[in-house]
Amino acid sequence: MLAKRIIPCLDIKDGQTVKGTNFVNLRQAGDPVELGRAYSEQGADELVFLDITASHEGRKTFAELVRRIAANISIPFTVGGGINELSDVDRLLNAGADKISINSSAIRNPQLIDDIAKHFGSQVCVLAVDARQTGNGWKCYLNGGRIETDKELRTWTKEAQERGAGEVLFTSMNHDGVKTGYANEALAELASQLSIPVIASGGAGRMEHFRDAFTLGKADAALAASVFHFGEIKIPELKSYLCGQGITVR
């Protein structure tokens, strides 16, 4: 079995790390460069940087901040937010990103997935999906969860895989920031239908939640923000807990 990955996420707004509940009520959580360095030193497997205002405000991800974070970490680094064309990808990879996460832009222009995979390789392309469970399944949302689309979670992620996405980062909007556990049932469905890795996001509150994402949700990686930013869970302790639960971690 491949080792499971633990991934802290930096949600960036106006150059600062923030964390909200159900995608609203944002509060500040610290300097992204300092946090990135700390997570890298603590043994995080990867780092995700999402400029949560970039798509909404129609501006480009702040490449200079990406460059500063990349210079301070020694782990793979995924960047998302406001990436609409290949030149955006090129600029961020040059700034030090290892992978690019696309969300709203991929829904609006699915061909972007094909183009990134073709020009830079599937391993660079992470499809991020913000989805909410309603009476009729899981619906995908645009612009940081502000706009509902007609895309359904399973069909959209399957299409993205076929177009060349190398990973899926699935955030449950129902679970985000609530700290009651990940959307394990939906995760397990995605894991069973996709051949690319699935990253669980939204809902981590306790160490058991990470265990459940891996055992029940069959996720390949688990992403979290506030539990790490506010020191509620420490990465070395989380990894030794998971080891004790029989889960292979790096």
UniProtKB/Swiss-Prot annotation:
CDD domains: HisF (cd04731)
Annotated coiled-coil segments of the chain: none
EC annotation from Swiss-Prot or TrEMBL: 4.3.2.10
Superkingdom, natural source: Bacteria
Annotated catalysed reactions: 5-[(5-phospho-1-deoxy-D-ribulos-1-ylimino)methylamino]-1-(5-phospho-beta-D-ribosyl)imidazole-4-carboxamide + L-glutamine = D-erythro-1-(imidazol-4-yl)glycerol 3-phosphate + 5-amino-1-(5-phospho-beta-D-ribosyl)imidazole-4-carboxamide + L-glutamate + H(+)
Pathway where it operates: Amino-acid biosynthesis; L-histidine biosynthesis; L-histidine from 5-phospho-alpha-D-ribose 1-diphosphate: step 5/9
Keywords: Amino-acid biosynthesis, Cytoplasm, Histidine biosynthesis, Lyase
A Pfam match: His_biosynth
GO molecular function: imidazoleglycerol-phosphate synthase activity; lyase activity
Any one GO BP annotation for this protein: L-histidine biosynthetic process
Compartment annotation: Cytoplasm
Entry annotation: catalytic residues: D11, D130
Magnesium in keyword set: no
A single GO cellular-component term on record: cytoplasm
Transmembrane segments: none
Function: IGPS catalyzes the conversion of PRFAR and glutamine to IGP, AICAR and glutamate. The HisF subunit catalyzes the cyclization activity that produces IGP and AICAR from PRFAR using the ammonia provided by the HisH subunit.
Similarity section: Belongs to the HisA/HisF family.
Subunit details: Heterodimer of HisH and HisF.
UniProt name for this protein: Imidazole glycerol phosphate synthase subunit HisF
Organism field: Bacteroides fragilis (strain ATCC 25285 / DSM 2151 / CCUG 4856 / JCM 11019 / LMG 10263 / NCTC 9343 / Onslow / VPI 2553 / EN-2)
